[in-house]
């Protein structure tokens, strides 16, 4: 139970950082040819939205433990992708007017949400690597399809009367932030793995201790799961 919650938080933060980093790495390659920068508060809010909505989606999938919970949780994660993207675009300051194609905006939201809805049912179908990889690929497809469709919806008309805020974050500093985010994802994954290994070792030691106590008993002991015998102690085995 405890490790389940730990992995939920680790997964939410690492996935949220991954979604956020993917968007802003793509934004670093986007050059409108006029001065631009990023509003710090909205950039931070876009990261928080990605993490919180990913956590909410994963929690729904785990708590509901049903097909509906998995699909709805995946849709929430997909909605988090769209929320993060448009908050990130709201943070983008440029010396010009930003125009949006409403049809492509709606299409981008639907793509992210619908493909995201398929990612959790696939990734959490069972513990096999095949479905884990399938879920990861679907989540990647949700991120990429949303991002490129959404970027196709934007047009920028240069306007020299509009100025970028002096407090806006330049692209070079954003690159540093993305690098830190990527490093954080790796650290969180390693930390979660270390905690999981420690918990498994503790469980194994506790099982060995209980087995030793059972074998020390004079009476024969039999542990069953329904009609199936799971284990017996030495006294029962000699009967």
What residue ranges belong to the model's regions?
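Juxtamembrane or sensor-core-proximal signal-transducing alpha helices
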Residues: 119-125, 178-208
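Conserved hydrophobic beta-strand signature of PAS-family and PAS-like sensory domains
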Residues: 229-233
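PAS/LOV and related PAS-like sensory modules
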Residues: 206-227
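Membrane-interface transmembrane-helix boundary segments in multi-pass integral membrane proteins
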Residues: 102-105, 164-187
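PAS/PAS-like sensory domains across diverse signaling proteins
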Residues: 227-228, 238
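Individual alpha-helical transmembrane segments in multi-pass integral membrane proteins
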Residues: 2-91, 102-114
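Alpha-helical transmembrane segments of multi-pass integral membrane proteins
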Residues: 7-15, 77, 126-149
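Hydrophobic transmembrane alpha-helices
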Residues: 139-168
């Amino acid at each position: 139970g405890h490790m389940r919650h730990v992995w939920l938080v680790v997964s939410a933060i690492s996935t949220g950082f991954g979604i956020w980093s993917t968007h802003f790495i793509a934004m670093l390659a986007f050059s409108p040819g006029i001065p631009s920068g990023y509003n710090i508060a909205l950039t931070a809010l876009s990261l928080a939205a990605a993490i919180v909505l990913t956590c909410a989606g994963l929690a729904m999938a785990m708590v509901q433990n049903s097909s509906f919970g998995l699909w709805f949780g995946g849709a929430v994660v997909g909605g988090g992708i769209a929320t993060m993207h448009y908050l990130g675009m709201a943070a983008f300051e440029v010396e010009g007017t930003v125009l949006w194609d409403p049809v492509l905006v709606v299409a981008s939201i639907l793509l992210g949400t619908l493909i995201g809805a398929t990612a959790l049912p696939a990734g959490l179908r069972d513990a096999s690597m095949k479905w884990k990889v399938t879920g990861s690929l679907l989540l990647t497809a949700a991120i990429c399809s949303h991002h490129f469709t959404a970027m196709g919806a934007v047009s920028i008309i240069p306007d020299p009367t509009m100025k970028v805020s002096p407090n806006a974050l330049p692209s070079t500093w954003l690159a540093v932030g993305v690098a830190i985010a990527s490093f954080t994802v790796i650290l969180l994954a390693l930390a979660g793995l270390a905690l999981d290994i420690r918990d498994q070792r503790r469980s194994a030691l506790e099982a060995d201790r209980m087995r030793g106590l059972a074998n020390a008993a004079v009476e024969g002991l039999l542990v069953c799961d329904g009609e199936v015998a799971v284990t017996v102690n030495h006294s029962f085995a000699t009967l």
